[in-house]
A protein has these predicted regions:
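Beta1-alpha1 glycine-rich phosphate/pyrophosphate-binding loop at the start
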Residues: 5-32, 41-44, 57, 70-80, ...
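C-terminal catalytic lobe of FAD-dependent flavoproteins
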Residues: 12-13, 17-37, 42-45, 50, ...
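Ferredoxin-type iron-sulfur electron-transfer modules in oxidoreductases and energy-metabolism complexes
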Residues: 24-41, 64-65, 69-104, 108, ...
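Short cysteine clusters
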Residues: 46-49, 54-58, 63, 67, ...
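Feature captures the FAD/FMN-dependent oxidoreductase FAD-binding
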Residues: 87, 149, 154-158, 210-256, ...
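Glycine-rich dinucleotide-binding loop and its adjacent helix/turn
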Residues: 131-149, 206, 211-228, 251-314, ...
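FAD-site-proximal beta/loop scaffold in flavoenzymes
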Residues: 260-292, 391-466
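A conserved FAD-binding loop/helix module that cradles the flavin
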Residues: 304-309, 314, 459-493
């Protein structure tokens, strides 16, 4: 390493964000970048580890530990420290097709497994990664790389989220003719409509990369829902292989009285609507909008946070977020040792913004909704909540148990359900004759990504279930490699 004592000499530093009161006035990204000297100092904090844990991804205790795409983190940290930015970019692109996505929206399990993080703040890997790729775009180093020759084989990639885009780029660079079939009106899947613009800019970040893929020769077809207006069997006939990257899009519902009232929406419907409105699609009168309303978000994950941030920008009157789990500790608990992902209390951007306006953290823990109450017009006007505790049942499972006498009424004219996803939509797998697993995801081998139908592969959330963007990119790359091997008998793809 260029600076073996950097972790002793420099403290962790991350860029300042725009203030909550300022950034809620628009939908622009709110993270700043560090200057070059500061970035080089941060890269110098990367230790000369005997056994680095940051760069090797694995599932551990229900979460991710290390980098799922196996980024060469110690190598590009050292190159940044030495000012060799172009070489750092080359190392970064060896393993990650889209570091501008992960550098913005990844929760950074690499930092959770950083060796320095055992007893000090970890290296700011995520920020360094994003700085490398943005430097690459600024300098003109990120250019289309079309294949020199074509194999004559045609591959359909269904879905243009992170898994689909990674699979498409890898297969195209192997020389295959790739068509991406996307049912929405724009590319990106989750990247376009599932993540708000202030976290991932649609024009300056997502479409910038899409344009590169198009220039490399990848064809995108929009408003193409395979199994509906685009026949599944026609796709099988027209292409030599298919890679399914359709995501885990079936939302977990709230089966309580009043669920059918107007004003109760799934989080993804709300987030999609907000982005479409921002991009100028659809009549404003049809929007799901939070302006002037008492908003309740049910669910405490990243999607819930995105709903909070979006509602703040739309001008909600009040905002409350209910979480059925207990409040995490401020430091790792004994049953959450390094290098597991640290399950600790944090305040994300949406909660910061709500606290700045309303003077309190919007989250209420160990709380669930018992029923929704409507007005004479059939619109939700309030909900009834109850506090819960967690107990072990006869089967040894941890289950929530209501606490008597803790019912409360909460005003709400907009209720957003952000409780995760239960699996992939089943119509397309059924049309193709593909087996599903016990979790209602597409059954595909964890090494070969092959489904029960020869020539059809599956990657990303539709195979592994709800997960991270970085896992989706890793799976898209893996499925592309195995698809290329199936088509050609061997492969040079990583």
């Amino acid at each position: 390493m260029g600076k073996p004592t950097g972790f002793i000499e420099y403290l962790r530093e991350t860029p300042l964000d725009r203030s909550p009161s300022e950034r809620v006035r628009d939908w622009k990204e709110f993270h700043h970048q560090l200057d070059e000297k500061s970035l080089r100092n941060q890269a110098a904090r990367c230790m000369d580890c005997g056994v680095p844990f940051c760069h090797t991804g694995k599932a551990m205790s229900g979460g991710a530990s290390g980098c799922p795409v196996n980024n060469l983190i110690p190598e590009w940290n050292d190159l940044v420290y030495r000012g060799l930015w172009r070489e750092a970019l080359e190392r970064l692109h060896r393993t990650n097709n889209f570091p501008e996505f992960t550098g913005r929206v990844c929760p950074a399990p690499c930092e959770g497994s950083c060796v320095l993080g055992i007893n000090a703040p970890p290296v700011s890997i995520k920020n360094i990664e994003n700085s490398i790729i943005e430097r690459g775009f600024e300098e003109g180093w990120v250019v289309p790389e079309p294949p020199k020759t074509r194999t004559g084989r045609k591959v359909a990639v269904v879905g243009s989220g992170p898994a689909g885009l990674a699979a498409a780029q890898q297969l195209n660079r192997a020389g295959h003719s790739v068509t991406v079939l996307e049912r929405a009106d724009r590319p990106g899947g989750l990247l376009m409509y599932g993540i708000p613009n202030m976290k991932l800019d649609k024009h300056e970040v997502v479409m910038r990369r899409i344009h590169q893929l198009e220039q490399e020769g990848i064809r995108f077809v929009y408003n193409a829902e395979v199994g509906d207006n685009y026949e599944a069997q026609m796709m099988r006939r027209d292409f030599d292989a298919v890679v399914l990257c359709t995501g885990a899009t079936v939302p977990r519902d709230l089966p309580v009285e009043g669920r059918s009232l107007q004003g109760v929406h799934f989080a993804m419907d709300y987030l999609t609507d907000a982005t479409q409105a921002l991009l100028g699609k659809g009549p404003k009168s049809a929007m799901i909008e939070a302006k002037g309303l008492d908003v309740v978000v049910i669910g405490g994950g990243d999607t819930g946070t995105d709903c909070v941030g979006s509602a703040m920008r739309q001008g909600c009157r009040t905002l409350t977020q209910f979480e059925i789990m207990s409040k995490p500790p401020t430091e790792r608990a004994a049953d959450n040792p390094w290098p597991e992902w640290p399950r600790v209390y944090k305040t994300d951007y949406g909660q910061e913004e709500a606290a700045a306006k309303f003077g309190r953290d919007p989250r209420a823990y160990l709380t669930t909704v018992k029923r929704l109450v409507g007005d004479e017009a059939g619109r939700v006007k309030e909900l009834v909540t109850v506090e819960v505790g967690w107990e072990i049942d006869a089967q040894g499972r941890s289950v929530p148990v209501e606490k008597p006498g803790t019912e409360r009424r909460q005003p709400a004219q907009l209720v957003l359900l952000a409780m995760g996803f239960t699996g992939t939509e089943e119509s397309l797998p059924l049309d193709l004759g593909i087996e599903l697993d016990e979790r209602r995801n597409i059954r595909a081998d964890t090494v070969s990504y092959t489904t029960s139908v020869p020539g059809v592969f599956a990657a990303g959330d539709c195979r592994r279930g709800q997960s991270l963007v970085v896992w989706a990119i890793a799976e898209g790359r893996g499925a592309a490699r195995e698809c290329d091997r199936w088509l050609m008998g061997s492969t040079d793809l990583p």
